[in-house]
Amino acid sequence: MSRLLVDDVTKTDARALLNVNKMATISDIVAPSNEYIYASGANELTVVEGCVIAVGGAGIFKTANTILTAANLDAGSAFAVGKDYYVYICDSRIDSADEKYVISLNSTYPTGWNATNSRKIGGFHYGRCRKVDSNLQPLNGSSVIFGTGWESAVSNGIVPRSVWTLGHRPKCSPEGMVYLGGGTWVDIYLNSDDGAKGLKSEYGCAPMTGTESMNWYNFVERLAKSGKRLPNYAEFCAYAFGSPAGLDNANTNAWSATSNTGSGVTG
């Protein structure tokens, strides 16, 4: 440890020099809320104003209320269902230029930028979203709670409670997860093999069903390797609320038809 700053009015002590470089070492992210990014529409995010963010030790920015859309993608022109996206703030290193926001599928840094001039500040999952009211109760097309046809009132979009930031996120990797409440995050999809003896929540994968000779303990062990745990019954009921029951004669709501001869894929 050593003293980083001193009060020296003569400015002869280098430790009294307060510049962008030094400020970047002591300013991480200062935000009015841990949830400084949120889903403000099916295909848009909002970065709240008043955040102070350091990028690469050479740039510090104060955010304005900013809307991000697919136009901020580093590649492509639309979000894809089942994908996890990362939000970056980037610094062109031009003093007169403001920050630039880039959304990318890359988990390290966006295309066209690098680790020194970009910083990951959050992310989200783009998937299937059920129509709900402010209390998260399912609605049908006419906005009636559990009204006729509510089961099919689903559309593609940014999963609102999947949006995470550096101050609001699970302890494990946040991909394929949503916020349940009370500090708890849960997986969106049935767990599948992550290839590293753990489990993951990912769209379009073959789920682990128990037919792989895995028992309860195996699931506990493999989830622990991924930094997760099994939900308790109350948590399961909370995040399963609003999911329609599977049908015996169709796979409309889930892979549940009695005529199925094998397992499907997640999503």
Tell me the role of every PLM-derived stretch.
Residues 15-17, 93-111:
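Short, surface-exposed terminal/edge motifs of secreted or surface/virion proteins that either
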Residues 134, 140-157, 162-267:
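Short aromatic-cysteine micro-motif
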Residues 21-83, 92-93:
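Glycine-rich, flexible loop motifs
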Residues 33-55, 111-117, 156-178:
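Carbohydrate-recognition beta-sandwich/jelly-roll modules
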Residues 90-91, 122:
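N-terminal accessory interaction module
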Residues 86-90, 185-187:
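Residues within well-ordered beta-strands of beta-sheet-rich folds
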Residues 1-25, 219:
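Fibrous stalk/shaft segments of extracellular and virion attachment machinery
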Residues 104-150:
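Extracellular receptor-binding modules and their adjoining Ser/Thr/Gly/Asp/Asn-rich linkers
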